[in-house]
C-alpha cells in the first residue's frame, strides 16, 4: 500500500498537483509508534500544505511550540502549515507570516470529523478561488479561507456523526447568523 501511495504522489508531484497532508494520526491502527512516525516523516516532503493538531505537532516534531517547529516543517515543497487548535481556532503559517482565526464558542455534540471538515473547507476555498500559486494568495484571501474553514469545522461539532454534520452553503449561512457573525466570506481582499 505504501508503495502505491508513493507512486501516486510522485505522479502528482510531476504533474504539478497541489498536495495537502493531514497526518490524522490513528495510534490504535499501528503496533509501533516509531513505525507510524517514520511513515509520516516519509510522506511529509510531498506536502504543499500540512495540517497539524497539537498532538500531531508534538508527535512528529518532538516540540509543543509551533513557532519552534516551523523551520523543521516549512521546507521543501511545503508552503503552508495549518495548525488547528480546536475551540481556540487555527493559524496558517507561511514563510514570514502567520494568519490566525479565532475559534467559535458552540455547544459541542461530537468532534468526529471536525479536522477533516476544516481542511476540506479550506481546500474548497482554494479550489473555488482557482489560484494555483500558494505564494501569490493574499493575506486577506487566506484570512477569509481560514475563517470559513474554522466556521465549517465549528458547525461540524454541533451535530452527531461526521457525515450528518457536513453542511451545505445555506445551512452554514444559517449557522453563521446564529453566531451573530457579520463576516462575509466572498471578499477577495
Which role does the model predict for each range below?
Residues 1-72, 88-89:
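Conserved beta-alpha-beta core of the PfkB/ribokinase-like small-molecule kinase fold
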Residues 10-11, 64-189:
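Conserved phosphate-binding/catalytic region of the ribokinase-like
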Amino acid at each position: 500500500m505504501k508503495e502505491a501511495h508513493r507512486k501516486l504522489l510522485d505522479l502528482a508531484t510531476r504533474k504539478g498537483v497541489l498536495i495537502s497532508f493531514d497526518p490524522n494520526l490513528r495510534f490504535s491502527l499501528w503496533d509501533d509508534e516509531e513505525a507510524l512516525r517514520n511513515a509520516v516523516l516519509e510522506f511529509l516532503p510531498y506536502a504543499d500544505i500540512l495540517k497539524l493538531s497539537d498532538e500531531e505537532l508534538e508527535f512528529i516534531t518532538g516540540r509543543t511550540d509551533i513557532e519552534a517547529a516551523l523551520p523543521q516543517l516549512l521546507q521543501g515543497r511545503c508552503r503552508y502549515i495549518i495548525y488547528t487548535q480546536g475551540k481556540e481556532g487555527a493559524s496558517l503559517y507561511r514563510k514570514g507570516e502567520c494568519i490566525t482565526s479565532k475559534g467559535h464558542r458552540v455547544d459541542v455534540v461530537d468532534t468526529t470529523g471536525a479536522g477533516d471538515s476544516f481542511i476540506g473547507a479550506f481546500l474548497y476555498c482554494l479550489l473555488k478561488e482557482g489560484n494555483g500559486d500558494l505564494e501569490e494568495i493574499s493575506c486577506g484571501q487566506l484570512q477569509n479561507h481560514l475563517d470559513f474553514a474554522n466556521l465549517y469545522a465549528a458547525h461540524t461539532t454541533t451535530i452527531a456523526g461526521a457525515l450528518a454534520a457536513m453542511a451545505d452553503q445555506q445551512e452554514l449561512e444559517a449557522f453563521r447568523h446564529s453566531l451573530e457573525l457579520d463576516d462575509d466570506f466572498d471578499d477577495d481582499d
